[in-house]
């Protein structure tokens, strides 16, 4: 391992020990904000510290085994060779883990997020599939112990949704779900298809980090056009007799957000503003990323909703991720919220790309 990496790890261990000491300080314990911030830092440093300590132990084990290999006793030498082999394997494995733990973290990864699903091409079937995707993500959130709250929904006439925006609250929600952004295509026989022909429909998914109040962009009232209207359900029937639904247009960017799920206009406006802020920040981040992007692929997508990332093929029972050429034949499990088998390989590929980029710049 490079000396520069070892130095960085030693610095992190020193900070870990310092934070550990601070958490026992009565002044810190009495300051809830400071205690909370240090507790979060402690948990972030703990994993890399434990891994580095295991790496150092493996180095010590190797040195001890190499000394044992110099013994006159043949049985001891054979035992030493086994220990040398085990120690070298542990050192290699732990060095790889440490490199991943040292990769630059997205500051948004620990945040809650907004999940936006829109029906695309495919008519009624696209709306039904949007509903299926929302159910899939809801099941996944439940498995993770996350909370999911509908922010805004526009129901389709024959089931599902034209558009659905939900807030996902839980540890690391954005960091996990951000790889779901892009185009999702479904191939199946619709319930209304009498000839048994397979139809192709599509939905788009956008995942945006929730922005903490302290980091919210300044949105001037003069830059907003706010319309109120009556909330309506599928088929246009009115579900509310007051103008509680809100449509907010951010004039400088043309960003439009609607919210009609609450009976209170005030609550709908608050929800719409939260989504609007997330969209504005996301658009700015995508613009900056585009300015500095190179030829390296980006598994997070270009931000273009038309980027097709996944196909769900019902006749064959398969799901394919086009970014990493992965196909699994577990469609039913995936639609029941078992997404980890799809998410983990994408995260691993993303980390491999980050490591390759670091190696190029080293």
From Swiss-Prot:
* Xref: HAMAP family: Rel_fac_1 (MF_00093)
Predominantly, its location class is: cytoplasm
List the protein's name. Peptide chain release factor 1
Q: What role is this protein assigned?
A: Peptide chain release factor 1 directs the termination of translation in response to the peptide chain termination codons UAG and UAA.
Q: Subcellular localization, per the record?
A: Cytoplasm
* Sequence similarity: Belongs to the prokaryotic/mitochondrial release factor family.
Does the keyword field hold Protein biosynthesis? yes
Modified positions (N5-methylglutamine) in chain numbering: 237
Gene Ontology terms for molecular function: translation release factor activity, codon specific
Q: How is it modified after translation?
A: Methylated by PrmC. Methylation increases the termination efficiency of RF1.
Pfam short name (any one): RF-1
> What gene does the UniProt entry assign to this protein?
prfA
